[in-house]
C-alpha cells in the first residue's frame, strides 16, 4: 500500500443521524495518523469506513487509486484480510479459543486451507515470543490480564502482515503500563517495518509521535496538523 484515501465521505443513519459530513483524508505509507475528537465526533465511523467494515452513504474510499468501497463483499474481504489489521478497544477475543487460536483466526478466514494455516503456526509463536506471551499460548482469554489480552489483539492484527493497522481507542480500557507498551509498539513497528497506523483516540500522548493529526468534531474535520 502506498496510499489510502477517503474523498467527500458522508455517513448517514436512519433517524436523521449524520455521523460524518463530507470528510476527505489521505494516509500514506509509513504514516501514523491520529484522529482526535470527543465521543460521538465520528472517529469510529471513519475508521470503519476506511477499513471497509462499513460503507459510506456518499463519497469514496481509494486504495492506491482503486475505488474499493463499491467492490462486492468478497472483494472487500480479500482486501481487509490481505492489507488491513484491526485493534479494537475491547479486543473481541473469542472466549472459546485459546490465545494462539485467536491469533490464527484471521488466517482461517483468509486461507481456508489447513496446510497453509499450519505453516503460519510458527509465525504466530514468533509473535507471541516477541510479546513475551509464548508460555500463555494455550490459555483462554478469561485467564488473561487486560494487558495480556491487548498483546493478543496486537498479535492477531499482525498475523496476516497487513500494510496498515486501524486502532480504535486502543488504550481506552487498559492500565497505564499496558498503554505505555502500546505506545512503544506503535513507534517500534513504524520505525522497524514502516508500518502505517490509523488511530482514533482521546489519548493525547499519541500526538508526540503522530505524523498527522486530524481533529474531528460533530462529524466534520476541524483541522489537520502535519
Residue positions per predicted region:
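Helix-to-loop junction immediately C-terminal to a conserved catalytic motif
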Residues: 51
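Conserved ABC ATPase signature
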Residues: 140-149
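Short coil-to-helix segment of the ABC ATPase nucleotide-binding domain corresponding to the Q-loop/switch region
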Residues: 97-106
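A short, proline-enriched helix->beta-strand linker immediately N-terminal to the Walker B motif
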Residues: 159-163
Amino acid at each position: 500500500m502506498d496510499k489510502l484515501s477517503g474523498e467527500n465521505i458522508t455517513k448517514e443513519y436512519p433517524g436523521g443521524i449524520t455521523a460524518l459530513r463530507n470528510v476527505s483524508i489521505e494516509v500514506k505509507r509509513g504514516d501514523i495518523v491520529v484522529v482526535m475528537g470527543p465521543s460521538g465526533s465520528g472517529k469510529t465511523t471513519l475508521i470503519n469506513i476506511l477499513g471497509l467494515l462499513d460503507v459510506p452513504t456518499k463519497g469514496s474510499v481509494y486504495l492506491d487509486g482503486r475505488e474499493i468501497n463499491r467492490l462486492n463483499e468478497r472483494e472487500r474481504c480479500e482486501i481487509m484480510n490481505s492489507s488491513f489489521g484491526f485493534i479494537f478497544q475491547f479486543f473481541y477475543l473469542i472466549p472459546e479459543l485459546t490465545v494462539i487460536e485467536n491469533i490464527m483466526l484471521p488466517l482461517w478466514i483468509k486461507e481456508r486451507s489447513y496446510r497453509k494455516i499450519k505453516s503460519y503456526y510458527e509465525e504466530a509463536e514468533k509473535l507471541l515470543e516477541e510479546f513475551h506471551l509464548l508460555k500463555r499460548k494455550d490459555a483462554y482469554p478469561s485467564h488473561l490480564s487486560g494487558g495480556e489480552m491487548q498483546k493478543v489483539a496486537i498479535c492477531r492484527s499482525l498475523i496476516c502482515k497487513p500494510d496498515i493497522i486501524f486502532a480504535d481507542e486502543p488504550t481506552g480500557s487498559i492500565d497505564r503500563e499496558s498503554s505505555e507498551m502500546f505506545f512503544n509498539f506503535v513507534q517500534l513497528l513504524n520505525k522497524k517495518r514502516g508500518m502505517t497506523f490509523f488511530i482514533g483516540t482521546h489519548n493525547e500522548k499519541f500526538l508526540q509521535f503522530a505524523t498527522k493529526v486530524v481533529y474531528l468534531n460533530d462529524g466534520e474535520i476541524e483541522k489537520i496538523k502535519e
